[in-house]
Amino acid sequence: MVLGMSLQTFTFVHVLLSLMGIGSGFIVVFGLLSSKRLNGWTLLFLVTTVLTSATGFLFPVERLLPSHIVAILSLVALTIAILARYRFHMAGAWRTTYVVGAVIALYFNCFVGVVQAFEKVPTLKALAPTQKEPPFLVAQLVVLAIFVALGIIAARRFRSVSMLPA
């Protein structure tokens, strides 16, 4: 039992939060690319992504796992993004700080998604059973390249002073 739920139910909730974070995160990033705040989507993205990272620590394990390290890094990026957006109102350099933090948090969620896909999808598992094989590495490099590009473009295009209505 985790938080009063069976492990299966808790896992379902964790995965649902993760998928909501990824879906809303992409909507937020595409909003950033067109200089739109998308306040509701942003709140959904930030809350579900924080909850995804936080609930990852509640799974019964006996040692610190790589997924915990990613969750810690994600929570750091999310904390910075949340402060930049809501405490510092994206003034000056906080605008870029917010964009970078949000994109990094979404990247970490997608990074773990790729890991999970290679663990759970039989075809992908066959291609990279230990996740040290070229197909896994190529997939992760492609995801990283996409997020680096999205982050750079979003940071250049998102303008807090001349933002369009949400």
Regions found by a protein language model. Give the residues of each.
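Polytopic transmembrane helical bundles with strong interfacial aromatic enrichment
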Residues: V2-A166
